């Protein structure tokens, strides 16, 4: 399966996230949903935050033109919030999954979908 298929089918296609991307550990975009553009600088900042989250814990982070307040940040997952919407990011051994949800979607539902896809990819060696 292609990275784009994972974005279109396993993330956005579930209805649990409205926008999604898969990034490399260097922050470069491998696949993205339409209209969701993570800049290289944003990807690099996000990728680095999995190793040292101090900066994003203090000041939040930006993705695709939206500033998020950091709710959770560890070496596997970074969760952000903007009003009633938010973002779930999960790191695997080779990629970073990004799933954005809107105010109509429960955060736990979005987190479940992104985390489960990450678990699957980790199990496949990714």
Curated annotation (Swiss-Prot):
Keywords: Actin-binding, Cytoplasm, Cytoskeleton, Methylation. It is found in: Cytoplasm, Cytoskeleton. InterPro entries: PFN (IPR048278), PFN_euk (IPR005455), PFN_sf (IPR036140), Profilin_CS (IPR027310). It holds the Pfam family Profilin. The record marks 116 as: Actin binding. The modification N6,N6,N6-trimethyllysine is found at residue 104. It comes from the Eukaryota. Belongs to the profilin family. Binds to actin and affects the structure of the cytoskeleton. At high concentrations, profilin prevents the polymerization of actin, whereas it enhances it at low concentrations. By binding to PIP2, it inhibits the formation of IP3 and DG. Occurs in many kinds of cells as a complex with monomeric actin in a 1:1 ratio. This is Profilin-1B. It comes from Acanthamoeba castellanii.
């Amino acid at each position: 399966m292609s990275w784009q298929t994972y974005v279109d089918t396993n993330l956005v296609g579930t209805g649990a996230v409205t926008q999604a991307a898969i990034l490399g550990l260097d922050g470069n975009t491998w696949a993205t949903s339409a209209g969701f553009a993570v800049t290289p600088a944003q990807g690099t900042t996000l990728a680095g935050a999995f190793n040292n989250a101090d900066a994003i814990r203090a000041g939040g982070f930006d993705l695709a033109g939206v500033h998020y307040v950091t709710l959770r940040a560890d070496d596997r997952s970074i969760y952000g919030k903007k009003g009633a919407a938010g973002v779930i990011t999960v790191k695997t051994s080779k990629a970073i999954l990004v799933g954005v949800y809107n105010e109509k979607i429960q955060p736990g539902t979005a987190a479940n979908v992104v985390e489960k896809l990450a678990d699957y990819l980790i199990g496949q060696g990714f």
